[in-house]
Design a protein with these regions (language model features):
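Extracellular glycan-recognition regions
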Residues: 22-213
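Bacterial N-terminal signal peptides
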Residues: 7-16
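Sec/Tat signal peptide C-region and signal peptidase I cleavage site
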Residues: 17-21
Length: 213
Protein backbone atom coordinates (compact mmCIF):
# COMPACT_ATOMS: atom_id res chain seq x y z
CA UNK A 1 0.00 0.00 0.00
CA UNK A 2 2.80 2.42 0.90
CA UNK A 3 4.54 1.57 -2.37
CA UNK A 4 1.33 2.32 -4.30
CA UNK A 5 0.87 5.69 -2.56
CA UNK A 6 4.52 6.56 -3.20
CA UNK A 7 4.17 5.65 -6.88
CA UNK A 8 1.06 7.84 -7.19
CA UNK A 9 2.88 10.78 -5.59
CA UNK A 10 5.81 10.37 -7.98
CA UNK A 11 3.47 10.21 -11.00
CA UNK A 12 1.56 13.29 -9.85
CA UNK A 13 4.83 15.14 -9.26
CA UNK A 14 6.22 14.45 -12.71
CA UNK A 15 2.90 15.14 -14.44
CA UNK A 16 2.67 18.40 -12.52
CA UNK A 17 6.15 19.43 -13.62
CA UNK A 18 5.27 18.54 -17.20
CA UNK A 19 2.09 20.62 -17.16
CA UNK A 20 3.88 23.57 -15.62
CA UNK A 21 6.58 23.37 -18.26
CA UNK A 22 4.04 23.17 -21.07
CA UNK A 23 2.09 26.19 -19.88
CA UNK A 24 5.02 28.39 -18.92
CA UNK A 25 4.68 32.00 -20.03
CA UNK A 26 7.71 33.44 -21.76
CA UNK A 27 8.32 37.17 -22.12
CA UNK A 28 11.16 37.66 -24.63
CA UNK A 29 13.61 40.44 -23.79
CA UNK A 30 12.63 43.14 -26.28
CA UNK A 31 15.51 45.33 -25.14
CA UNK A 32 17.86 42.84 -26.83
CA UNK A 33 16.39 43.02 -30.35
CA UNK A 34 19.63 44.51 -31.69
CA UNK A 35 21.58 41.46 -30.51
CA UNK A 36 22.04 39.11 -33.50
CA UNK A 37 22.72 36.21 -31.14
CA UNK A 38 19.15 36.47 -29.87
CA UNK A 39 17.19 37.96 -32.79
CA UNK A 40 17.34 37.76 -36.58
CA UNK A 41 16.36 40.84 -38.59
CA UNK A 42 15.35 40.66 -42.26
CA UNK A 43 14.85 43.64 -44.59
CA UNK A 44 14.26 46.25 -41.90
CA UNK A 45 16.04 48.64 -39.56
CA UNK A 46 15.20 48.88 -35.87
CA UNK A 47 14.49 52.45 -34.81
CA UNK A 48 15.40 53.23 -31.21
CA UNK A 49 12.51 53.91 -28.85
CA UNK A 50 10.48 52.53 -25.97
CA UNK A 51 8.83 49.92 -28.23
CA UNK A 52 10.24 47.71 -30.98
CA UNK A 53 9.93 49.96 -34.04
CA UNK A 54 10.59 48.54 -37.50
CA UNK A 55 11.03 51.07 -40.29
CA UNK A 56 9.01 51.08 -43.51
CA UNK A 57 10.64 50.13 -46.81
CA UNK A 58 9.86 48.02 -49.90
CA UNK A 59 9.29 44.32 -49.28
CA UNK A 60 8.22 42.39 -46.21
CA UNK A 61 10.18 42.70 -42.97
CA UNK A 62 10.71 40.17 -40.21
CA UNK A 63 12.31 40.20 -36.76
CA UNK A 64 12.37 36.69 -35.29
CA UNK A 65 13.48 35.12 -32.02
CA UNK A 66 16.46 32.81 -32.53
CA UNK A 67 16.36 30.31 -29.69
CA UNK A 68 12.70 29.37 -29.57
CA UNK A 69 10.61 26.73 -31.33
CA UNK A 70 6.87 27.35 -31.12
CA UNK A 71 4.30 24.63 -31.83
CA UNK A 72 0.94 25.35 -30.22
CA UNK A 73 -0.02 27.97 -27.67
CA UNK A 74 -1.03 31.58 -27.17
CA UNK A 75 0.77 34.70 -28.37
CA UNK A 76 -0.10 38.06 -26.81
CA UNK A 77 1.28 41.33 -28.12
CA UNK A 78 0.53 45.04 -28.37
CA UNK A 79 0.73 46.41 -31.91
CA UNK A 80 0.56 49.85 -33.51
CA UNK A 81 0.46 50.83 -37.15
CA UNK A 82 -0.54 53.98 -39.03
CA UNK A 83 -3.75 55.16 -40.66
CA UNK A 84 -2.39 55.33 -44.19
CA UNK A 85 -3.84 53.07 -46.85
CA UNK A 86 -1.41 50.55 -48.27
CA UNK A 87 1.35 51.43 -45.82
CA UNK A 88 0.37 49.66 -42.61
CA UNK A 89 0.51 45.86 -42.51
CA UNK A 90 1.57 44.77 -39.02
CA UNK A 91 1.43 41.43 -37.23
CA UNK A 92 3.02 38.24 -35.96
CA UNK A 93 4.67 35.48 -37.99
CA UNK A 94 4.84 31.98 -36.53
CA UNK A 95 5.99 28.51 -37.54
CA UNK A 96 8.78 30.38 -39.32
CA UNK A 97 11.15 28.24 -41.38
CA UNK A 98 13.01 31.16 -42.95
CA UNK A 99 12.35 34.74 -44.05
CA UNK A 100 10.17 33.60 -46.96
CA UNK A 101 8.43 30.55 -45.46
CA UNK A 102 6.09 31.15 -42.53
CA UNK A 103 2.49 31.60 -41.42
CA UNK A 104 1.33 34.98 -40.16
CA UNK A 105 -1.58 36.92 -38.75
CA UNK A 106 -1.47 40.60 -39.57
CA UNK A 107 -3.64 43.69 -39.35
CA UNK A 108 -4.43 46.60 -41.66
CA UNK A 109 -5.18 49.48 -39.26
CA UNK A 110 -6.14 51.81 -42.12
CA UNK A 111 -9.13 49.52 -42.78
CA UNK A 112 -10.37 49.31 -39.20
CA UNK A 113 -12.98 52.07 -39.50
CA UNK A 114 -13.53 52.08 -43.25
CA UNK A 115 -17.13 51.11 -44.14
CA UNK A 116 -15.99 49.76 -47.51
CA UNK A 117 -12.78 48.00 -46.44
CA UNK A 118 -13.34 46.92 -42.84
CA UNK A 119 -13.70 43.30 -43.98
CA UNK A 120 -9.99 43.39 -44.80
CA UNK A 121 -8.83 44.37 -41.30
CA UNK A 122 -7.22 41.12 -40.10
CA UNK A 123 -5.59 38.60 -42.41
CA UNK A 124 -4.06 35.11 -42.31
CA UNK A 125 -1.32 34.25 -44.81
CA UNK A 126 0.98 31.28 -45.37
CA UNK A 127 4.01 32.18 -47.45
CA UNK A 128 5.36 31.53 -49.97
CA UNK A 129 2.31 30.20 -51.80
CA UNK A 130 -0.72 31.50 -49.94
CA UNK A 131 -0.27 35.25 -50.16
CA UNK A 132 -3.04 37.69 -49.26
CA UNK A 133 -3.75 38.27 -52.96
CA UNK A 134 -4.01 34.56 -53.77
CA UNK A 135 -6.29 33.93 -50.80
CA UNK A 136 -8.55 36.89 -51.54
CA UNK A 137 -8.89 35.91 -55.19
CA UNK A 138 -9.55 32.22 -54.52
CA UNK A 139 -11.18 32.20 -51.07
CA UNK A 140 -12.87 35.60 -50.62
CA UNK A 141 -13.75 36.50 -47.01
CA UNK A 142 -12.40 33.19 -45.67
CA UNK A 143 -8.96 34.27 -44.48
CA UNK A 144 -9.68 37.93 -43.61
CA UNK A 145 -12.30 39.68 -41.51
CA UNK A 146 -13.30 42.86 -39.70
CA UNK A 147 -11.96 43.24 -36.16
CA UNK A 148 -14.16 43.52 -33.11
CA UNK A 149 -13.96 45.68 -31.13
CA UNK A 150 -12.65 48.31 -33.56
CA UNK A 151 -9.44 49.98 -32.32
CA UNK A 152 -8.29 53.47 -33.18
CA UNK A 153 -6.16 52.94 -36.32
CA UNK A 154 -3.40 55.22 -34.99
CA UNK A 155 -3.29 53.81 -31.45
CA UNK A 156 -2.02 50.68 -29.74
CA UNK A 157 -4.26 47.61 -29.75
CA UNK A 158 -3.84 44.22 -28.13
CA UNK A 159 -3.80 41.03 -30.19
CA UNK A 160 -4.14 37.47 -28.91
CA UNK A 161 -3.32 34.69 -31.35
CA UNK A 162 -4.21 31.15 -30.26
CA UNK A 163 -2.59 28.39 -32.29
CA UNK A 164 -3.77 24.80 -31.93
CA UNK A 165 -2.65 23.29 -35.21
CA UNK A 166 -4.31 23.55 -37.62
CA UNK A 167 -6.78 25.95 -35.95
CA UNK A 168 -5.83 29.60 -35.42
CA UNK A 169 -8.00 32.10 -33.53
CA UNK A 170 -7.39 35.84 -33.34
CA UNK A 171 -8.79 38.06 -30.58
CA UNK A 172 -8.52 41.85 -30.42
CA UNK A 173 -8.40 43.98 -27.26
CA UNK A 174 -9.25 41.04 -24.98
CA UNK A 175 -12.58 40.35 -26.67
CA UNK A 176 -14.20 37.02 -25.81
CA UNK A 177 -15.25 36.61 -29.45
CA UNK A 178 -12.59 35.93 -32.09
CA UNK A 179 -12.22 38.33 -34.99
CA UNK A 180 -10.85 35.55 -37.19
CA UNK A 181 -10.84 31.75 -37.07
CA UNK A 182 -8.98 29.81 -39.77
CA UNK A 183 -7.22 26.53 -40.39
CA UNK A 184 -3.58 26.74 -41.35
CA UNK A 185 -2.72 25.99 -44.96
CA UNK A 186 0.85 24.89 -44.29
CA UNK A 187 1.95 21.46 -43.15
CA UNK A 188 4.51 22.93 -40.72
CA UNK A 189 3.56 22.36 -37.11
CA UNK A 190 6.42 24.27 -35.51
CA UNK A 191 8.93 27.03 -36.09
CA UNK A 192 10.13 30.38 -34.83
CA UNK A 193 8.04 33.43 -33.89
CA UNK A 194 8.64 36.99 -34.99
CA UNK A 195 7.29 40.47 -35.62
CA UNK A 196 6.17 40.93 -39.23
CA UNK A 197 5.55 44.03 -41.35
CA UNK A 198 4.42 44.11 -44.96
CA UNK A 199 5.53 45.97 -48.05
CA UNK A 200 6.40 49.63 -47.35
CA UNK A 201 5.08 49.27 -43.79
CA UNK A 202 6.54 50.28 -40.48
CA UNK A 203 5.24 48.91 -37.20
CA UNK A 204 5.55 49.13 -33.44
CA UNK A 205 5.42 46.19 -31.02
CA UNK A 206 5.60 45.74 -27.26
CA UNK A 207 4.52 43.47 -24.38
CA UNK A 208 5.11 40.19 -26.22
CA UNK A 209 4.30 37.07 -24.21
CA UNK A 210 4.16 33.48 -25.40
CA UNK A 211 2.58 30.48 -23.71
CA UNK A 212 3.57 27.21 -25.41
CA UNK A 213 1.56 24.04 -24.96
Amino acid sequence: MKKLIYSMIVIQFFFGISLLAQDKEISPDLSSVNNPDQWTLHNRRIIDGEAVHLNGQPGDGLLSINEMVFKNGTINVDIKGIDERGRSFVGIAFHILNDSTFDAIYFRPFNFKSPERKGHSVQYISHPNNTWYFLRENFPEKYENPVMPVPDPTDWFHATIVVNYPKVEVFVDNSEEPSLVVEQLSSRKEGKIGFWVGNNSEGWFKNLTIVSK
